Amino acid sequence: MIPFNAPPVVGTELDYMQSAMGSGKLCGDGGFTRRCQQWMEQRFRSAKVLLTPSCTASLEMAALLLDIQPGDEVIMPSYTFVSTANAFVLRGARIVFVDIRPDTMNIDETLIEAAITDKTRAIVPVHYAGVACEMDTIMAIAKKHNLFVVEDAAQGVMSTYKGRALGTIGHIGCFSFHETKNYTAGGEGGATLINDRALVERAEVIREKGTNRSQFFRGQVDKYTWRDIGSSYLMADLQAAYLWAQLEAADRINLQRLSLWQTYYDALEPLAKAGRIELPTIPADCVHNAHMFYIKLRDNDDRSELIAWLKEAEILAVFHYIPLHSSPAGEAFGTFAGEDRYTTKESERLLRLPLFYNLAPVNQRTVINTLLSYFG
């Protein structure tokens, strides 16, 4: 079976993990954590990067940092992973879902302002497939209405919008290093990017269980104590060691994924020109990271038939999110603002193909040939 995904392995992970074990410090904020954070701060030009156990934890940390309260409203797309919404629902917020653009599957920036009320506190754009939302417009709306922007850049590590790294444009950015992402911290992991310097000190406190422990270890205070609400949002240094191996190879991983992505695009473009499928759209201002390659079929039935065809050929291709607003929790905790023109319809057409760093060219060719044979 050709899998849909396999975690990236570059070859130096075990050496670094053994080094972490030999250091005598396996908990958070060890040497490998500092290396990873500094690398991202310099590479992506973020004021402060803090490793977390997951992107879910990073989003929860953002909700705490913005002091989201019961009754507050947070705007986001419905076509996203449940963690995007849950982080704010846990604080008592009401989620306001906005329709997506069919070209990028990202939130439609032209519909955001109409969804704003006097209860709105934040906008959470989700960079689907590592392709940027229209951030200039979103940031202008946020500034006009005095709102925070939290970028869910779980899929966006190494992608850019007008030359700026995704996750560094909003007030806060959230990365994922889950095993399904381009880079992993040994299976689970994330990072919070603090781009508003006024939020940095409190972010460190919230991440360290509500204490000023980080200041204590830097020698800024002679003891640390409970200062604020918080939780344990540190990544173990053993995981950071795995991640460091991946970040050292980040450019190599990125180029390989882009090559695989382009191979799919070139091979399937004739089908798109013939009107049999639709291919991903990359806007001119966006540089993507080849996180995902998807095609769109005519409808849900057509997609189901193709999934079965590929499965018969020992190829695993998968659909993606069920829109949150149609779920029981989405109905309880959220509201869809305006018309659902594209969210549900487009989600039922989208099919993701196998794409991962270690995908062998012969296996990718098998996927392509099987697809071409399906369409005759």
Stretches with model-predicted labels:
Residues 50, 75, 96, 149-150, ...:
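Structural detector of well-ordered beta-strand residues that form the stable sheet scaffold
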Residues 168-212, 237:
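Active-site PLP attachment segment
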Residues 1-26, 225-227, 354:
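N-terminal "arm"/small-domain region of PLP-dependent enzymes with the aminotransferase-like
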Residues 86-88, 141, 165, 182, ...:
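Hydrophobic/aromatic ligand-binding patch that stacks against planar heteroaromatic rings
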Residues 34-39, 43-49, 110, 114, ...:
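PLP-dependent aminotransferase class I/II
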Residues 151-186, 215-216, 222-227:
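Conserved active-site segment immediately N-terminal to the catalytic lysine
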